[in-house]
């Protein structure tokens, strides 16, 4: 299967045309318009600093349904201690920078990625979840929200269970808002342990179509910060 070379024109080939590894296209740019178009079509960018921009739509697709988040017995005990505070959209750039820093030398979160997703955040499409301990940022995640779908990009942790706490809180808030799924993109055992599953790409695209039929919860998500914090059940 050939890999398509993008031009300045804002268009993507159909996701079903991706090669067996999931690579669909190469080139283009990371403008907000192109990124949003990609997510709406089940496509995401993933590349290293020394590579051209690569666009992916793997089959199968790893997703997490918010209601299916797994909270282990040990994690429930940890959450009961209430050691962490979780917030939304209070320091997006700090979160994405930490995601990049902890993968230094082996990261797709390039300066261009940071700038592009920060612009998406300013436009109300990209969001961060932050985990705090005694006033210090110790974990978090970021991603893009369109319709009733959340597209997870990366998470980090510098203390035990900090990123898990952020993800659990996100799932609970998204479930309350009727979100259909979190796109985890590519399978990992860690994601599976948290409840993520692989589904066929065609099924993922059907969920995506259904999710995009709803209005996007656009803007800053700080309103979540006024609500009750993470539940342990």
UniProtKB/Swiss-Prot annotation:
It catalyses: N-terminal L-lysyl-[protein] + L-leucyl-tRNA(Leu) = N-terminal L-leucyl-L-lysyl-[protein] + tRNA(Leu) + H(+); N-terminal L-arginyl-[protein] + L-leucyl-tRNA(Leu) = N-terminal L-leucyl-L-arginyl-[protein] + tRNA(Leu) + H(+); L-phenylalanyl-tRNA(Phe) + an N-terminal L-alpha-aminoacyl-[protein] = an N-terminal L-phenylalanyl-L-alpha-aminoacyl-[protein] + tRNA(Phe). Belongs to the L/F-transferase family. This is Leucyl/phenylalanyl-tRNA--protein transferase. It comes from Acetivibrio thermocellus (strain ATCC 27405 / DSM 1237 / JCM 9322 / NBRC 103400 / NCIMB 10682 / NRRL B-4536 / VPI 7372). The keyword Transferase applies. Pfam families: Leu_Phe_trans (PF03588). GO terms for biological process: protein catabolic process. It comes from the Bacteria. Its main location: cytoplasm. It is found in: Cytoplasm. The gene is aat. NCBIfam families: aat. One of its GO terms (molecular function) is leucyl-tRNA--protein transferase activity. One of its GO terms (cellular component) is cytoplasm. Its EC number is 2.3.2.6. Keywords: Acyltransferase, Cytoplasm, Transferase.
């Amino acid at each position: 299967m050939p890999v398509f070379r993008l031009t300045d024109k804002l268009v993507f080939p159909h996701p079903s045309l991706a090669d067996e590894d999931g690579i669909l296209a190469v080139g283009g740019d990371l403008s907000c318009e192109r990124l949003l178009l990609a997510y709406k079509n089940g496509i995401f960018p993933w590349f290293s600093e020394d590579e051209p921009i690569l666009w992916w739509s793997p089959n199968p697709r790893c997703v997490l349904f918010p209601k299916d988040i797994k909270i282990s017995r040990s994690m429930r005990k940890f959450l009961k201690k209430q050691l962490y505070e979780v917030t939304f959209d209070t320091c997006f750039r700090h979160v994405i920078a930490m995601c990049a820093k902890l993968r230094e030398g082996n990261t797709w979160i390039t300066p261009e990625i940071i700038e592009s997703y920060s612009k998406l955040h300013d436009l109300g499409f990209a969001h961060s979840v932050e985990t705090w301990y005694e006033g210090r940022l110790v974990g978090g995640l970021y991603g893009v929200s369109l319709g009733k779908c959340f597209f997870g990009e990366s998470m980090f942790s510098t203390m035990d269970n900090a990123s898990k706490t952020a993800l659990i809180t996100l799932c609970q808030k998204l479930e309350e808002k009727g979100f259909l799924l979190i796109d985890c993109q590519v399978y990992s055992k860690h994601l599976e342990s948290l409840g993520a599953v692989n589904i066929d790409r065609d099924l993922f695209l059907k969920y995506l179509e259904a999710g995009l039929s709803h209005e996007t919860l656009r803007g800053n998500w700080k309103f979540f910060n006024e609500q009750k914090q993470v539940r342990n059940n």
